[in-house]
Amino acid sequence: LNLILQTVILAILGMAVYARLKHSMVKHAALMGSGIALHTVAIGAIMVPSLLSMGALLRKLLTSFALLTIVHATLGSIVEILGVCLVATWLSNRTNVEKCFKRKNIMRVTIALWLTELILGIFVYMMLYLPA
């Protein structure tokens, strides 16, 4: 379920980038906000409970699975914080697009980290559910 949700979020982010390229800033911001909201739901409803249920798998911190999961969760937390901050900044002053332009580099870092985190999440999924 989470992998499907992450694919939907990726599609939403793709549409948001397309809206930005078409100079539709309001649509871009709304789509990004929707993506962050879905990501927040996925973290709270799926990822955190899943992580908490893996206690036995994560007890040995020096295994590749545990290290990969920790890096994935850490990057995911950073992405979530950056995304929420970016959306909150936009929501606090929707009429001033210049403030958003000033955060362009933070947006780029956020999307790069999110894509990295997504790839790591796919590896975690493969390690859990595909035969070795």
Question: What residue spans do the PLM features occupy?
Answer:
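Alpha-helical membrane insertion/targeting regions
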Residues: 1-132
